[in-house]
């Protein structure tokens, strides 16, 4: 990824209505790492939150900072508070193969609200490369690997979902769909602009 690369992910709800727009820019690229900065706006253009996270390239593949796994809407709710995060980074190997299993990832977020601490745990597991597919979005046509995984969020109650991700070399996420445990689509994200 080159410094200054910009891209946009549009988030849709289960009724296919825009629920948010995320604008990303690649900042501070070094030999084997980069910082991603993003701003999230609601469907009316009002800024909800902004944040950044790191990406590292190694011989094993690309690792994405575990903090990126927390939803921007959630982070926006706690931006005035002291938040601690620990976890395991998300790894995408350099050479993906259909049928390949990918390592699990997790993040634990602790929000300090004296006298209490609130904890939220997010796990990504059963990550697997299911196939290859070419898909077209407003940003263009992309050859993608299709990756499926399950996610589990725990904050008092446990919420599980299954996900399907279309990942393209040199571009990253092109599309993602999220399903509830009954298999109904509850949301999707699509790459709607990309500018190098």
Regions found by a protein language model. Give the residues of each.
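Acidic, serine/threonine-rich low-complexity disordered tracts
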Residues: 1-51, 57, 109-196
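An acidic-aromatic
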Residues: 41-98, 103-105
